Amino acid sequence: MSGNKVEVDKRRTFAIISHPDAGKTTITEKVLLFGNALQKAGTVKGKKSGQHAKSDWMEMEKDRGISITTSVMQFPYNDALVNLLDTPGHEDFSEDTYRTLTAVDSCLMVIDSAKGVEQRTIKLMEVTRLRDTPIVTFMNKLDRDIRDPLELMDEVEEVLNIACAPITWPISSGKEFKGVYHLLRDEVILYQSGQGHTIQDSRIIKGLNNPELDEAIGAYAAEVREELELVLGASNEFDLEMFLAGELTPVFFGTALGNFGVDHILDGIVEWAPKPQARETEVRDIQPEDEKFSGFVFKIQANMDPKHRDRVAFMRICSGRYEQGMKMHHVRLGKDVNVSDALTFMAGDRNRAEVAYPGDIIGLHNHGTMRIGDTFTQGEKFRFTGIPNFAPEMFRRIRLKDPLKQKQLLKGLVQLSEEGAVQVFRPIDSNDLIVGAVGVLQFEVVVGRLKSEYKVEAIYEGISVATARWVYCDDERKLEEFRRKCSNNLALDGGDNLTYIAPTMVNLNLSMERYPDIQFAKTREN
């Protein structure tokens, strides 16, 4: 077996997705704890103590106690090497989150068991559907009062259109939470409260009918036996092929804050989640075992280190291997570059990468030449597909406090749009600058970063824009006619792509009817 294949087989690259406050950042911490990447988990809320969550390293994130940007963390677990991409869980985040899901091979979906499936989870699941990404589900917060577990699984099946197969099953909840029964191992893992920041071995009782269980939890033993008869009759068995096809999700129950159930998830991900998979290009599928190096940029982060005004491009390796000092071909620019200082990450901590394999995420120092979606190879001329831009959902006009700084404003906005923080639109018929985002917080982030990183003070004004669509047409004459008649609604985005800015959804629908030869696209390939 080649060294490359051994390394590929070991890797599991996944992201955590959830609605805000479902406990995602806590789970990230506990996953790192179980992976021996942390000695003690940071507490996520009320960060006055100075002990910040490891994955929340940007100043604004530390101030507010929420994850705004995507962090990348690598750690060993059992015989595997896990790459965890932590994505913003806050209500307001950027499409950066969506794109991160194109760089992983599986996802862990975290659900607040008291609330069930929430809006942001639905949106994120729509994105995972674009690539049929395998999903593992964790029903969190079992140490609180929760909804009926069967009802929770029914809701996942109905709302997210994915079959559920319980792997662990809770024994009561809230103050009476006793632990879980592991259906595949036929064992009960007992819960002890007060294990929030350290890992202790849980007591395990083999067999559901073991008299030790009655001694340990009393009347709850008979209750769970009765409940499981119903559960086994009403739910799906775990099917690996259906899981890998994105059609079925294994479901685990636990409490991240109580350090309970996180190791069960990790065991499942290492055992079932796919190793790095083949990736589509315009030419052919690229296999991870291919000898020649290839990778794509899915995120650009500016100024990760306030001491150095740097920008780092996050690259997912798809084939071959990265070696320090190697030559890469930047396909879009048609140039070769020598890379000797690529980085690996433990959230804000960076280390120089000497070698990295498919599934790994490395950081490349970027002086404004790299963009999201860029492909790097060892000479071949192909481009990875499926790294989209998504149409923004909210819009503001941005205005300078000092009109003489127009040049700096445009530079800052273009860089932030290349990074994926926001999108910028320049109307064809005016000198306005319109900023589009997926969530409100991104507007605040952009103004803050323009001030701190580009020394530009800007303010927002409301604007009547409902949505934006990228505009395409194979017939150049019809496109030109459309441009002439609809110039009031047309703009160029940060990459000079023609965009239709619709003041209302009614306006968009009318334009689509009036110009059937014009394609109005919600997403655009990078």
From Swiss-Prot:
GO cellular component entries: cytosol
SUPFAM superfamilies: EF-G C-terminal domain-like (SSF54980), P-loop containing nucleoside triphosphate hydrolases (SSF52540), Translation proteins (SSF50447)
Nucleotide-binding is among the record's keywords: yes
GO annotation, biological process: regulation of translational termination
Protein name: Peptide chain release factor 3
Record carries keyword Ribosomal protein: no
Record localization: Cytoplasm
Domain tr-type G residue range list: 9-277
Function, in words: Increases the formation of ribosomal termination complexes and stimulates activities of RF-1 and RF-2. It binds guanine nucleotides and has strong preference for UGA stop codons. It may interact directly with the ribosome. The stimulation of RF-1 and RF-2 is significantly reduced by GTP and GDP, but not by GMP.
Protein family according to the UniProt entry: Belongs to the TRAFAC class translation factor GTPase superfamily. Classic translation factor GTPase family. PrfC subfamily.
Domain of life according to the entry: Bacteria
InterPro entries: EF-G-like_DII, EFG_III/V, G_TR_CS, P-loop_NTPase, PrfC, RF3_C, RF3_dom_3_sf, RF3_GTP-bd
Keywords of this entry: Cytoplasm, GTP-binding, Nucleotide-binding, Protein biosynthesis
Gene3D superfamilies, A to Z: P-loop containing nucleotide triphosphate hydrolases, Peptide chain release factor 3, domain III
A GO term for molecular function: GTPase activity
Residues binding GTP: 18-25, 86-90, 140-143
Major subcellular site: cytoplasm
